[in-house]
From Swiss-Prot:
Family: Belongs to the ABC transporter superfamily. Sulfate/tungstate importer (TC 3.A.1.6) family.
Membrane topology: Peripheral membrane protein
Species lineage: Bacteria, Pseudomonadati, Pseudomonadota, Gammaproteobacteria, Pseudomonadales
Catalytic activity from the UniProt record: sulfate(out) + ATP + H2O = sulfate(in) + ADP + phosphate + H(+); thiosulfate(out) + ATP + H2O = thiosulfate(in) + ADP + phosphate + H(+)
E.C. number: 7.3.2.3
Protein name (Swiss-Prot/TrEMBL): Sulfate/thiosulfate import ATP-binding protein CysA
Length: 329
């Protein structure tokens, strides 16, 4: 099921949430809408679902304009950040709910419903919890049950609104890897909203970077990271440094893309060591370049030669190994 977003705009009073958005999502693709709070990503997801109405523009599913269709007629599965499970129902009944609510002529028999529910619970690896209640589950388990419930009605499109946002970091990492594997198995056109760059990079086939109601860049994780369209995309997709040049330009580079030396070396810049911070396998060194207010951060392996006996206040020499040259604004 392909999705086309055509010239979609949405305003809430004086706030322009979306401004002439155009986006094509291929059938079977997993796309991340990535951006900071207030960028319009959740509004766009809700418009695709039919939960919000655009002021202008169209939503097309597989060649059919569904802009005037009610959310119930779009056949989408929606997974919210906070699970939205029915607390008074067992896991089994939560997953079965959508099937039991179908019109009488479309409703499967109870035996078919039971078969489908157990199939989905096995798929999310939680069939052994079928008789439990939501409060007896961990956050990660609840979110997997919410996903199984969304898939029970066999939607054409799966939409996920920050599905892992309410979970702790370790569970989030496990679940996003699980979701990527699951998507490979079910091959269902899916769109998920996130503000977590690492999550988008790890899970999505393509990333749509949004800011202030517009799309800044669309591309594969590798494309948006290695070939950012502008300063905003570069900074939003990871830690970054800015080094001013004398000819009205500056260069952008990542902390892990820095060469360090204790000795003055050709092509290296002198800087004062302001902080040395061990981070496990790596160490972050914060540097101050004379004449520049912005600090430079470098991350190197913890046993790097330049770190031996290094102390704050000393002079260290650095060189960006990979950089992007940008004109000053």
């Amino acid at each position: 099921m392909s999705i086309e977003v055509r010239n979609v705009s949405k305003r809430f009073n004086s706030f322009q949430a979306l401004n002439a958005i155009n986006l094509d999502i291929n059938s079977g693709e997993l796309v991340a809408l990535l951006g900071p709070s207030g960028c319009g990503k959740t509004t766009l997801l809700r418009i695709i679902a039919g939960l919000e109405t655009p002021d202008q523009g169209n939503i097309v599913f597989h060649g059919e304009d569904v802009s005037g269709h009610d959310v119930r007629d779009r056949n989408v599965g929606f997974v919210f950040q906070h699970y939205a499970l029915f607390r008074h129902m067992s896991v089994f009944d939560n997953v079965a709910f959508g099937l039991r609510m179908k019109p009488k002529g479309e409703r499967p028999s109870e035996s078919k419903i039971a078969e489908k529910v157990h199939e989905l619970l096995n798929m999310v690896q939680l069939d052994w919890l079928s008789d439990r209640y939501p409060e007896q589950l961990s956050g990660g388990q609840r979110q997997r049950i919410a996903l199984a419930r969304a898939l029970a009605v066999e939607p054409k499109v799966l939409l996920l609104d920050e599905p892992f946002g309410a979970l702790d970091a370790k569970v989030r990492k496990e679940l996003r890897r699980w979701l990527a594997r699951l998507h490979e198995d079910i091959n269902l056109t899916s769109v998920f909203v996130t503000h977590d760059q690492e999550e988008a990079m790890e899970v999505a086939d393509r990333i749509v970077v949004m800011n202030k109601g517009v799309i800044e860049q669309i591309g594969s994780p590798g494309e948006v990271y290695d070939q950012p369209a502008n300063d905003f995309v570069y900074h939003f997709l990871g830690d970054s440094n800015r080094l001013a040049l004398s000819e009205g330009h500056h260069v952008l580079f990542r902390p892990h893309e820095v060469s360090l030396s204790r000795h003055e070396t050709e092509g290296h810049h002198a800087a004062e060591v302001r902080d040395i911070r061990p981070l496990g396998a790596t160490t972050r060194v914060t540097l101050k370049v004379e004449g520049q207010s912005e600090l430079i951060e470098a991350e190197v392996v913890k046993d790097h030669d330049s770190l031996t006996g290094l102390a704050r206040g000393e002079t260290l020499f650095f060189r960006p190994k990979v950089w992007q040259k940008v004109a000053d604004i």
